[in-house]
């Protein structure tokens, strides 16, 4: 039986790369999007082209009830997930004195509350299937060491790391591993306007990472062979920290 993996925020960038890699690994993929359904449909077509099944779940991870409704309906129809990749998130950067309450709440609620809103409806069905499972969250180098202009984002991602480690303790005897991948500077459409020369000078590898390199780490943690790896944070950042 082919196992199912849900990847949130999978219509572009890192999420797309992870969904495609996991499909090539042999998983059927649930693609989550908030609004860019046309882009998610394009990713679904790419997944079907490699012989795997793909379908789309559309909801806002910051809206608890709508997320629960969609996720519970999917489990009712298709059964519990083998794996979940919590990738979806947002950032609103700015110096701390200039951050508005909306800047703070929007980033913290979407990123940190999204952890609860996605995983809480899915964990109990994963336990009840009485089989191994995998949960991978996406944090950031900002959550590990902090970053100027990202106090809100750093706080949210540090919270995700803490929540990941705590959930791993709860699920360890259930054979469900819970790990975190923390990317550094990765080439996506979100980095196009950044001062790359200045940023690359701080990275020992002197280059940005590729989405496929982050996807490779997620692929490793999702594999059957990774069953003894849990409660870990894997950094993909060129040696930055």
Language model regions located:
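Conserved glycine-rich cofactor-binding loop
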Residues: 11-12
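Conserved glycine-rich Rossmann-like NAD(P)H-binding loop of the short-chain dehydrogenase/reductase
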Residues: 27-41
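Active-site helix of classical SDR
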Residues: 119, 156, 164
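Residue(s) in the substrate-gating loop at a strand-loop-helix junction
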Residues: 140
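Short C-terminal tail/terminal secondary-structure segment
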Residues: 145, 197, 201-202, 219, ...
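Short, small/polar-rich loop/turn modules that mediate ligand/substrate recognition or access, typified
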Residues: 172, 177, 229-231
């Amino acid at each position: 039986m082919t196992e199912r993996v849900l990847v949130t925020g999978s219509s572009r960038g890192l999420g797309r790369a992870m969904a495609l890699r996991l499909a090539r690994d042999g998983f059927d993929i649930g693609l989550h999007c908030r609004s860019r359904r046309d882009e998610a449909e394009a990713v679904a077509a790419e997944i079907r082209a490699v012989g795997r099944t793909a379908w789309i779940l559309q909801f806002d991870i910051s809206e608890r009830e709508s997320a629960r409704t969609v996720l519970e309906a999917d489990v009712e129809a298709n059964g519990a997930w083998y794996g979940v990749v919590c990738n979806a998130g947002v950032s609103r950067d700015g110096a701390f004195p200039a951050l508005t309450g909306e800047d703070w709440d929007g980033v913290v609620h979407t990123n940190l509350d999204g952890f609860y809103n996605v995983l809480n409806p899915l964990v109990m069905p994963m336990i009840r299937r009485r089989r191994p499972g995998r949960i991978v969250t996406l944090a950031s180098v900002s959550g590990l060491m902090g970053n100027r202009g990202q106090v809100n984002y750093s706080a949210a991602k540090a919270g995700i790391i803490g929540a990941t480690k705590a959930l791993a303790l709860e699920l360890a005897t259930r054979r469900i591993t819970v790990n975190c991948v923390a990317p550094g500077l990765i080439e996506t459409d979100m980095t196009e306007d950044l001062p790359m020369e200045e940023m690359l000078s701080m990275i020992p590898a002197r280059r940005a990472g590729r989405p496929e390199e982050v996807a490779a780490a997620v692929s490793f943690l999702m594999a059957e062979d990774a069953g003894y790896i849990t409660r870990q944070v894997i950094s993909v950042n060129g040696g930055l920290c």
